[in-house]
Amino acid sequence: SKNPNSRPLLLLHGWPGSISEFLNIIPKLAHPEKFGGKIEDGFDVIVPSLPGFGFSSQINKALGPRKIGKILNKFMIKNLGYKNYFVQGGDWGATIAGWIGLDSSKYCKGIHINCLPLRHPKGPKNSKEKKWEKKFNFDQITQEGYRTQQATKPQTLSYAMIDSPVGTAAWILEKFHGWSDLKMGKIEKTFSKDELLSNIMIYIITKSFNTASWIYFGRRKEGGRSFPKNFKKIKVPTAIAIFPKEMLEWPPKSYVNRIFNIKRWRKFPNGGHFAALEEPDILVSDILSFFNKDLKNI
């Protein structure tokens, strides 16, 4: 950013995404003045490949999202030298952002998420929350296949994919098709071929399909979706961006509010799981508004 007072913003992708998801929004967050905004709203934008994904160094064991959160906090503070930072993410990025908020609130000053894979250890409390959980569990029956495979026997799948570009493409594209708000029901009306292929090729050329899938195994080792039993509400100011075709349906606000210190809650008319690609301008606008206006004095 050309903003002399710019603040660092850590953007975190998930699976089966990559850093390529953010290519359309990085310039708008770093240089809003080039898109009709103000130079003083620009961020230093940091977009790492998660450990085991893409262009990050190879890992030799499964790492869960909590461990990755600690690694990334060290990366921001020790390696890059920032005193504090904001974080944004969807999918695994949202999970990691939550753990960063819990473990590193001294340094993380704001969270923006567009997905909620995390769960409160005490579960739902009221009838509305219980109804959501019942529906969520039913809806996930048809989604659990890939997740169970990657969380229990990821290497078996990896041997099939490591030398099969078509297999890798099929495994990934099925998610982009099923988790997105497709215009006219067609994937290429929502994503360009370049966007889809760039993401797939990152997995192929870096030979990271196997290690990227280990994060599911790592989460199982860390205890699963839920925070620990001694969990205390995350104090970091948090923005929630809800897109209607998100494959992980959002719980009621009352449930989310027991996890996060919600300062912004927005529901948008269009978009799905891959918000940075599907609705980049909406996502950018919400990020800029939250961090630069709602958290102006932080």
Task: List where the protein language model places each region.
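Alpha/beta-hydrolase active-site loop signature
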Residues: 16, 51-54, 118, 272
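The serine-hydrolase catalytic nucleophile loop
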Residues: 15-27
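Short beta-strand element of the alpha/beta-hydrolase
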Residues: 6-14
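C-terminal subdomain of alpha/beta-hydrolase-fold enzymes, centered on the catalytic histidine
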Residues: 150-298
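Alpha/beta-hydrolase active-site loop
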Residues: 60-79
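Conserved hydrolase catalytic core segment
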Residues: 28, 32-35, 79-133
